[in-house]
Amino acid sequence: MSLSAGLPVRPLLLLLLLLWSVAPQALPPRSHSLRYLFMGASEPDLGLPLFEARGYVDDQLFVSYNHESRRAEPRAPWILEQTSSQLWLHLSQSLKGWDYMFIVDFWTIMGNYNHSKVTKLGVVSESHILQVVLGCEVHEDNSTSGFWRYGYDGQDHLEFCPKTLNWSAAEPGAWATKVEWDEHKIRAKQNRDYLEKDCPEQLKRLLELGRGVLGQQVPTLVKVTRHWASTGTSLRCQALDFFPQNITMRWLKDNQPLDAKDVNPEKVLPNGDETYQGWLTLAVAPGDETRFTCQVEHPGLDQPLTASWEPLQSQAMIIGIISGVTVCAIFLVGILFLILRKRKASGGTMGGYVLTDCE
């Protein structure tokens, strides 16, 4: 999936950043993560950057960097006072190094795909996109895990395996790059050292700096709604306005968990105000809706929260509205009837004045 000069490239960049920053990162409760997202285009003149980086702690943006400025910019209030610290200096140097390596890796991958970066006379070249996500997680038991993945033109491409110091090819086109990079043992060891040592240490330091902000938790609200379509009836469980992102949603039938294969995967998306929303859908037989319950677990909740579709409450609300409107209508008709009757009995007078027709 390549990108041509005629496409609206900036919205696509934002979309790809959103998908890479949210979709793959479902974390278990009480774990913490440090992630860096890199993205660049082979034809930056088309509106995409040659290299752009963003750093996230527990899904909160705290630093950004681009090839043009070659400067790390603080993006969170709790990091502003650290821009002269050794931590920030080390981070800035790392981003500059990743900037250089990203471009070298980009040309390597393009060359192995035979995607020339030289534009022929009179031919509009295509712009290709490289994405990288790398970082680490520190779990509740203090164990750590790291990840380093490449994507090319919107598709999974390569993934680094710290235990074997090798790369795993996600598609046949990545095999040539895998073989070449597997020979670079010094770089592989540097990658492993970063994922297993430097990254967790940096994450713990950032968590200390952001204490009181990063630890904030916003519990979710849960509701279940019913929907009809030509394909049948479904229930939708919605978890609203929660933070952090990690959440577990499941369906229960008669208070027993359903098999995962019978349920559509949960979806979690950002609201734009540093909170998230998630939903989980389930196809049900008509009449069985009340047998199902949605159960939600989140770090902001003291215990799992459950919600069910409540048809009686919905029907009662509708009946109440109709009844209220009917009573109001009868009341207004009664008042109008009394006014007309009084007017007729008074012979057309009101308050001592005689009502006459206008001439």
Curated annotation (Swiss-Prot):
Protein keywords: Cell membrane, Disulfide bond, Glycoprotein, Ion transport, Iron, Iron transport, Membrane, Signal, Transmembrane, Transmembrane helix, Transport
Q: Where is this region: Connecting peptide?
A: 310-318
Q: What are the boundaries of the signal sequence?
A: 1-24
Entry's Gene Ontology BP terms: BMP signaling pathway; cellular response to iron ion; hormone biosynthetic process; intracellular iron ion homeostasis; iron ion transport; multicellular organismal-level iron ion homeostasis; negative regulation of antigen processing and presentation of endogenous peptide antigen via MHC class I; negative regulation of CD8-positive, alpha-beta T cell activation
- Any S-S bridges, and between which cysteines? C136-C199, C237-C294
Annotated region Alpha-2: the residues are 127-217
Q: Which coarse location class applies to the principal site listed for this UniProt protein?
A: membrane
InterPro entries with a match to the protein in the record: Ig-like_dom, Ig-like_dom_sf, Ig-like_fold, Ig/MHC_CS, Ig_C1-set, MHC_class-I_related, MHC_I-like_Ag-recog, MHC_I-like_Ag-recog_sf
Q: Name one GO molecular function term.
A: transferrin receptor binding
Give an example GO cellular component term for this record: HFE-transferrin receptor complex
Glycosylation (residues): N114, N142, N166, N246
User: Region (Alpha-3): which ranges?
Assistant: 218-309
Q: Which SUPFAM superfamilies match?
A: Immunoglobulin, MHC antigen-recognition domain
Compartment annotation? Cell membrane
Q: Which residues lie on this side of the membrane: Extracellular?
A: 25-318
Which spans are transmembrane here?
Answer: 319-339
Which residues point to the Cytoplasmic side? 340-359
Look up the domain of life of the source.
Answer: Eukaryota
Which PANTHER family has this protein been placed in?
Answer: HEREDITARY HEMOCHROMATOSIS PROTEIN, MHC CLASS I-RELATED
- Family the UniProt entry places it in: Belongs to the MHC class I family.
Assembly behavior: Binds TFR through the extracellular domain in a pH-dependent manner.
Output this protein's name: Hereditary hemochromatosis protein homolog
Species source reads Mus musculus (Mouse)
* Designated gene of the protein: Hfe
